[in-house]
């Protein structure tokens, strides 16, 4: 199986496809895939989900996925890695919270935008990224970066809203403490 890597903090790409070029593969990074137009099926970790315009998918590191295209589909891909999340753009106090929430995205197949208001919010942001990317005006890179940051936060909100247990300051901190303890001690005494 093909495994993709990302060698920069984030990358944006646009494509229009009549058929799937990439078969089942996995990443070492996060990927947001926005469907501008088209229909088909997204396969992720052996689960399928029909897609159409306006859907946003979150693919986390280690997920196995592919797209089965039924009608010509326009994709916007936003790829980012842990380096991007740990950069100063999100602020030190938000990094652990954001990372925790994003890592839980793989438990939620299908369109990540479940809040109707956020669906209406994300579409013009994606369109703004496309305009800035094509026109390359003064400060375009900075504007794109800020829009990506906002989309990531909107995605995190949608994930947090539908986690199995309510994520609040206490439950999230406890979960993080448990995960950190396990990670730090899993290979001790072996």
State where each predicted segment sits.
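A hydrophobic/aromatic-rich effector-binding and dimerization subdomain
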Residues: 1-11, 68-131
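Short, conserved beta-strand element in jelly-roll/cupin
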Residues: 26-43, 58
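Conserved short histidine dyad/triad with adjacent acidic residue
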Residues: 11-27
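Tight coil/turn sites that cap or link beta-strands
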Residues: 19, 53-54, 62, 81
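Short beta-strand His + acidic residue motifs that chelate non-heme Fe in jelly-roll/DSBH
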Residues: 41-43, 59, 64-71
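A cytosolic small-molecule/anion-sensing beta-strand core signal
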Residues: 36, 52-53, 61, 71
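Short, Lys/Arg-enriched, Trp-marked, Pro/Gly-tolerant hinge/linker segments that flank
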Residues: 108-117, 133-147, 153-189
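Short acidic-glycine-tyrosine-enriched beta hairpin
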Residues: 46-58
């Amino acid at each position: 199986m093909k495994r993709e890597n990302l060698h920069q903090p984030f990358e944006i790409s646009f494509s229009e496809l009549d058929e799937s070029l990439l078969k089942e593969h996995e990443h070492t990074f996060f990927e947001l895939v926005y469907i501008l137009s088209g229909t088909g099926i997204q396969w992720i970790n052996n689960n399928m989900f029909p897609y159409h315009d306006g859907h946003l998918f979150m693919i986390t590191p280690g997920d196995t996925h592919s797209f089965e295209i039924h009608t010509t589909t326009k994709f916007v891909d936003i790829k980012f890695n842990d380096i991007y999340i740990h950069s100063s753009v999100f602020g030190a106090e938000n990094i652990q919270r954001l990372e925790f929430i994003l890592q839980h995205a793989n438990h939620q197949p299908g369109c990540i935008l479940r809040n109707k208001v956020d669906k209406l919010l994300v579409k013009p942001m994606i369109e703004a990224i496309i305009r800035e990317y094509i026109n390359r005006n003064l400060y375009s890179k900075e504007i794109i970066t800020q829009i990506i940051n906002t989309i990531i936060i909107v995605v995190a909100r949608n994930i947090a809203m539908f986690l199995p247990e309510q994520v609040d300051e206490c439950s999230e901190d406890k979960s993080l403490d448990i995960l950190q303890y396990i990670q730090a001690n899993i290979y001790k005494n072996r």
